[in-house]
């Protein structure tokens, strides 16, 4: 697996995202710039500039028409993917830590930071796709259609379950909440991780019926969207920043590493700066991919399961296209199932 090294950022990566087709990869970092890349060869398509602060989060609509970003300049910006122009800016009282489109792209959630006397909130914005020619994308609602306020522990990440039925949020205290996608009422709250070890990432399976969390408590959990039942636990030896579920094969990929301030030796091995592959069903670690010089902040997998990308504290994005052995690898039990 020879990685493609994408260097377009001057500072550490915050989030990377493949689009629904998997031909594009979007990356955001602490340097105010959004980059778009061809995922097949790592060529840079272009950049989206306009933010005034570090960009924490990015998401692309299912039809790859709009791109949303959330930043430390307290705004959510909506971009036209094709032309690179900013079509809408929403202002918030505090920084925006996570944005995500619902499965049909008609709504966008934004998680805001708890700061300066403002409580952390999850705001839902209605998204319009203009006329049939793709014009008039500027006509977006000015105010959120729904606001969920996190009175107890602030939400750090959030996402939509299947059909946009629930909003699932991960919190600073290690708990996971389920909210009604229409009314915003809290239906369920589960202490999924150790108390006060915040959840750094939530990523869903392709059908959005379950999701994986990555936490500072050095573990990742597979959780059902319907009732927040914990299905599987993957234990690592380092705090985790990101986790993703691979389609096609039953694996999960975890990314982490010691926080930059805790690193005492800079050997790539020492800080445990590798992407770890675990078997989704059996919870065993099956391999690691090295390469980053610093913690992995974000991992994402190609929607066809043919490649994955990781973004690190070192400012690089690495795209790995899987080789044949990756797809051929099976446990003995899996082979027996096939023989039947």
From Swiss-Prot:
Intracellular or extracellular location(s): Cytoplasm
Keywords, in A-Z order: Cytoplasm, Initiation factor, Protein biosynthesis, Repeat, WD repeat
Listed GO MF terms: RNA binding; translation initiation factor activity
GO term, biological process aspect, one: formation of cytoplasmic translation initiation complex
Cellular component terms (Gene Ontology): eukaryotic 43S preinitiation complex; eukaryotic 48S preinitiation complex; eukaryotic translation initiation factor 3 complex, eIF3e; eukaryotic translation initiation factor 3 complex, eIF3m; nuclear periphery
First and last residue of the signal peptide: none
Placement of WD repeats on the sequence: 8-47, 50-91, 150-189, 194-233, 291-330
Keyword Cytoplasm in record: yes
Described purpose of this protein according to its UniProt entry: Component of the eukaryotic translation initiation factor 3 (eIF-3) complex, which is involved in protein synthesis of a specialized repertoire of mRNAs and, together with other initiation factors, stimulates binding of mRNA and methionyl-tRNAi to the 40S ribosome. The eIF-3 complex specifically targets and initiates translation of a subset of mRNAs involved in cell proliferation.
PANTHER family per the UniProt record, alphabetical: EUKARYOTIC TRANSLATION INITIATION FACTOR 3 SUBUNIT I (PTHR19877:SF1)
Subunit structure of this chain's protein: Component of the eukaryotic translation initiation factor 3 (eIF-3) complex.
Protein name as it appears in the record: Eukaryotic translation initiation factor 3 subunit I
Organism: Neosartorya fischeri (strain ATCC 1020 / DSM 3700 / CBS 544.65 / FGSC A1164 / JCM 1740 / NRRL 181 / WB 181)
Species lineage: Eukaryota, Fungi, Dikarya, Ascomycota, Pezizomycotina
Gene: tif34
């Amino acid at each position: 697996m020879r990685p493609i090294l994408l260097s377009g950022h001057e500072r550490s990566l915050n989030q990377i995202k493949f689009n629904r087709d998997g031909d594009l990869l979007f990356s955001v970092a602490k340097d105010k710039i959004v980059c778009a890349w061809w995922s097949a060869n790592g060529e840079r398509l272009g950049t989206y500039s306009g933010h005034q602060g570090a960009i924490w989060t990015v998401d692309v609509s299912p039809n790859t028409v709009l791109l949303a970003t959330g930043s430390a300049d307290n705004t959510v910006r909506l971009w036209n993917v094709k032309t690179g122009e900013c079509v809408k800016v929403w202002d918030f009282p505090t920084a925006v830590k996570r944005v995500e489109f619902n499965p049909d792209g008609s709504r966008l959630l934004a998680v805001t930071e708890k700061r300066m006397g403002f409580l952390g909130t999850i705001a839902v914005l209605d998204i319009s796709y203009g006329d049939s020619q793709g014009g008039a994308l500027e006509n977006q609602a000015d105010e959120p259609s729904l606001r969920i306020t996190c009175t107890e522990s602030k939400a750090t990440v959030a996402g939509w379950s299947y059909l946009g039925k629930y909003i699932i949020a991960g919190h600073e205290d290690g708990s996971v909440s389920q909210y009604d996608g229409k009314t915003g009422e809290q239906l369920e709250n589960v202490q999924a991780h150790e108390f006060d070890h915040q959840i750094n990432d939530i990523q869903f399976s392709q059908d959005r019926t379950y999701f994986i969390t990555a936490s500072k408590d050095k573990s990742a959990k597979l959780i059902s969207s319907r009732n927040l039942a914990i299905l599987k636990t993957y234990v690592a030896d380092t705090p985790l920043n990101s986790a993703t579920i691979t389609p096609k094969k039953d694996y999960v990929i975890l990314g982490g590493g010691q926080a930059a301030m805790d690193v005492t030796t800079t050997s790539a091995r020492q800080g445990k700066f590798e992407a770890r592959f675990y078997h989704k069903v059996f919870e065993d670690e099956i391999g690691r991919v090295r390469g980053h010089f610093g913690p992995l902040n974000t991992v994402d997998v190609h929607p066809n399961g043919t490649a994955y990308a990781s973004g690190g504290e070192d400012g690089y994005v690495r795209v790995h296209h899987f080789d044949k052995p990756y797809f051929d690898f099976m446990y003995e039990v899996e082979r027996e199932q096939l023989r039947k």
